[in-house]
């Protein structure tokens, strides 16, 4: 992993304090970069010492293509994939991932497949569901879950349970960043991990060492991005 301090990115706080980022390069592909901010960040399920900004990877053509190509190497030759379930706005990566998995190659188990790319919906109770028009792409299918970030694993686990409820067989979980190597026995392959970020801490809100030390929360984070406080 390469940290580049000479490529700053900045978030401006309401109180006048700026937060500068360092650029983190993936050890699996030098073309893949994310911006990493240090501070006190709160998500729905966890408090984290760093915020990994993966906006470019989800929305830039070249970066999304490179991310998909790198992730595809984990599934191309021994994991059948009929459907990719995309979370957190990862549909662009998902489309490229389907393309790379379906490439015509001698040893690829997914060669020339017409792979589906779908996104689940949240109902009024916050439960993940698939509408009737999408369920044929899940029922009895081999499914790969694509998620931007795995911290506590709760979102990945909910998606896993949802796919299994609809009769899908989860083959794996692909992520841009993951704290975990597996969720309920399903392996997680990621482009970045906590080992790439010195001092990275992720904990439940009740056990957050930064809260206990009286450190104020810098920003709220979710799959759409960051809101500075």
Language model feature labels by segment:
Residues 17-28, 160-229:
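PRPP-dependent phosphoribosyltransferase catalytic core
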Residues 91-144, 151-154:
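Short, glycine/charge-rich flexible loops or terminal/linker lids adjacent to PRPP-binding catalytic cores
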Residues 154-160:
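Conserved acetyl-CoA-binding loop-helix of GNAT-fold acetyltransferases
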Residues 15-80, 223-229:
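Active-site-facing substrate-recognition patch
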Residues 82, 141, 171:
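Conserved acidic residues
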Residues 86, 145-146:
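Hydrophobic Val/Ile/Leu positions in short beta-strands of Rossmann-like dinucleotide-binding domains
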Residues 1-18:
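Short, Lys/Arg-enriched N-terminal segments with co-localized hydrophobic residues
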Residues 80-90:
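Short glycine-rich phosphate-binding loop at a beta-alpha junction
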